[in-house]
Amino acid sequence: MQPTLLLSLLGAVGLAAVNSMPVDNRNHNEGMVTRCIIEVLSNALSKSSAPPITPECRQVLKTSRKDVKDKETTENENTKFEVRLLRDPADASEAHESSSRGEAGAPGEEDIQGPTKADTEKWAEGGGHSRERADEPQWSLYPSDSQVSEEVKTRHSEKSQREDEEEEEGENYQKGERGEDSSEEKHLEEPGETQNAFLNERKQASAIKKEELVARSETHAAGHSQEKTHSREKSSQESGEETGSQENHPQESKGQPRSQEESEEGEEDATSEVDKRRTRPRHHHGRSRPDRSSQGGSLPSEEKGHPQEESEESNVSMASLGEKRDHHSTHYRASEEEPEYGEEIKGYPGVQAPEDLEWERYRGRGSEEYRAPRPQSEESWDEEDKRNYPSLELDKMAHGYGEESEEERGLEPGKGRHHRGRGGEPRAYFMSDTREEKRFLGEGHHRVQENQMDKARRHPQGAWKELDRNYLNYGEEGAPGKWQQQGDLQDTKENREEARFQDKQYSSHHTAEKRKRLGELFNPYYDPLQWKSSHFERRDNMNDNFLEGEEENELTLNEKNFFPEYNYDWWEKKPFSEDVNWGYEKRNLARVPKLDLKRQYDRVAQLDQLLHYRKKSAEFPDFYDSEEPVSTHQEAENEKDRADQTVLTEDEKKELENLAAMDLELQKIAEKFSQRG
C-alpha cells in the first residue's frame, strides 16, 4: 500500500513539474525532468528504502517552481497595470488638463481649490475643461489626445445625466432672465477671444451664479409670473453694472452658447470636441432651445430699438411656460419661417399643441440652423405679416371666428403681433389661436382639403355607413329607390349601369330568397351572412351574362335532390355544420378544382351506403319493408336477397363484418380526401 501511494505522489509531482515548466526553458530542462521522473519511479519500484528524490532532481524541481512563481508575479503586475490604465485615463487626462490650464492662465488656479457643485457644473459645461476630479490622484502616464477627448466626453455625458434632473427647474427659471444678456453676448463675442479672458472672468461669474441661486431658492415658492417678473427686473438692473461678467455668464450656467461658438471657430481642438459631444444630447432634453429662443427672440427687439420692457415681457412670459412649452418653436423659429410652419401644420388638422411637431423638426436640423442666429430687418417682419394676413382673413371669412381673428388683425402689423402672438400671451396662443391658425394656414393654400373636411362634416359617420350599407346590399333589398339615394356618390358610368341592372335586381333577390329558405330548412344555426357571397354579388353587379333560366333549373333540381330516396353524397357529408351550401359549391365549378377527387369521394360514399343498407336490411327486414320509398334498383336487390336467403350463415356474417370493417376504413379515407380537397 505504501509504495503505491508513493508512486502516485511522485507521478503527480513529476507531471506538475513538467506542466509548470516555462515556455522559454522547456527545451533545455525537458530531458532533465523526464530523467528525474524515470529515476524516481525506478527507485521506488526496486528499493523501498532508497531515497525518493535525488539532489539533482530536487534542484530541477526547485528551479522550475521558482520560474513559475516569477511568471505569476509578473502576470499579476501586468494585469494590475492594465486595469489601472483602463480605469484611470480620465483622471490622468484631468491632471494633464489642469496643469496645462495652470500654464495657460494663472488666475484660474485660485478657483480650483474649493469648487462648489454649481461651479463644477458651470465650468464643466461652459469651458469644456474637466475639473470635477481635480483633487483625485494624478497618474504620470498620459493617454493620447483622442483617448482624452473620449474619456472626458463620456464623463461629461454621465455627469450631465445625473445633474440634469436636479438643475432642470432652476435652469429653466434662469433661462428667461438671461435672454437679453445672452443675445448681447452672442453679438459681442469675437472669433479671436482667447481662453485667458474666459479664465479671468470665471471667478466673477461664479460669484454672480451663487447670488442668483440664493435669490432663486428664496423666491421659488412664490407664484410663477410674479417670481419671474421680479427676478427679470433685478437681472436687468444688474446687467448695466456687470456687462463684462455677464458676457460669458450664459456659457457657464448652460454651456451651450459658448460651446457652439467654439465648435464653429475651432479655438481649441480638444475642448471644442468635448463641448460638441456634451451639447448634442441636450438637444433632446428640451433644454437647449429655450436659451436659443431667448436669444433669437430678443435680437429683433434690441436691433430695431424696442423698449427693454417689451422684450422683458416676452421673455418672462416664455419662461413662465417652463417645462411645458417649446419656447424656441413659438418665438424665433416661427417669426423666421412662418410659411414653413403653416405648411407643416396643415398635415395635422386636429392637433392642438404644436410642440411635438416642432420637436420633430428641430431634432433633425436644429443644431445646424441655430449656431449663429441671423438678425432680422424691418422688411423681413413686413413680409412675414404680408404672408400671414391672408390666412387670417380667410380665418374670419370662412368660419366667422370673430373675436380671435379680430384680435389678431387689430394688432400692429410688425412688432406688436409678433410679441403678442409669440411671446406676450403664449397660453392663449397655444389653446385657441394656434388651432385656428393651423387650420387656415393649411386651408389658405389648399382649399381642396377644406372641401373634403366640409364633406365629412356634412355627412356624419353614421350617414356614410348607411350609404355604404345600402350600396353593398342593394341586390338583396331589391328596392329601386336605393339608387336615388346614391346619386351624389356615383358618377355617370354607374348611373348608366343603374338602368342596365334594374331587372337583374329582382332576379338576384329571387335567388337569394331561395338560398335563404334552403339554408334555414337544413341548418338550425343558419346565419344569413353565409349566403351573402361576394361571388354572387360580383356576378350580379358586373353582368357576367350567365343564363338565369339555367340557374333556376339548377336550383329546382337541387331542391328536388335535397331529400332523394337515398342521396348518398348528401348523407356522407356534414350537412348541419360545414357543408350547408353544398349545392352552391356544385354549381360553382371554380370552387372545386379537383373534380377527380370529388368523383372518387362520391363513389366511396355510395359504396359505403350500399354496404350499410344491405347490413341493416338483413338484420331488420320487416323495418325496411315499410313505406319508406326506395329506388327500383334497390327494391330489386332487396327482393332478390329475401328470396335467396332469409337466415344468414356464419360465413355470411363474417363477410358482413369484414365489409363493415372495410366500410369504416373507406369512411376514414373519404374523410381524409374531403379534408385535403
Curated annotation (Swiss-Prot):
**What subcellular locations does the record give?**
Secreted
Entry keyword set? Cleavage on pair of basic residues, Disulfide bond, Glycoprotein, Phosphoprotein, Proteoglycan, Secreted, Signal, Sulfation
Q: How does it assemble?
A: Interacts with ITPR1 in the secretory granules.
Supply the PANTHER family for this chain: CHROMOGRANIN, SECRETOGRANIN-1
Bias class Acidic residues marks the residues at 262-272
Which portions of the sequence form the region Disordered?
Answer: 64-463, 475-512, 622-653
Tell me which family the UniProt entry assigns to this protein. Belongs to the chromogranin/secretogranin protein family.
Output this protein's name.
Answer: Secretogranin-1
Chain positions found as Phosphothreonine: 79
Positions carrying Sulfotyrosine are: 341, 474, 566, 624
Query: Top-down, what is the taxonomic lineage of the species of origin?
Result: Eukaryota, Metazoa, Chordata, Craniata, Vertebrata
Q: How is it modified after translation?
A: Extensively processed by limited proteolysis at conserved basic residues. Alternative processing are seen in different tissues. O-glycosylated.
Q: What does this protein do?
A: Secretogranin-1 is a neuroendocrine secretory granule protein, which may be the precursor for other biologically active peptides.
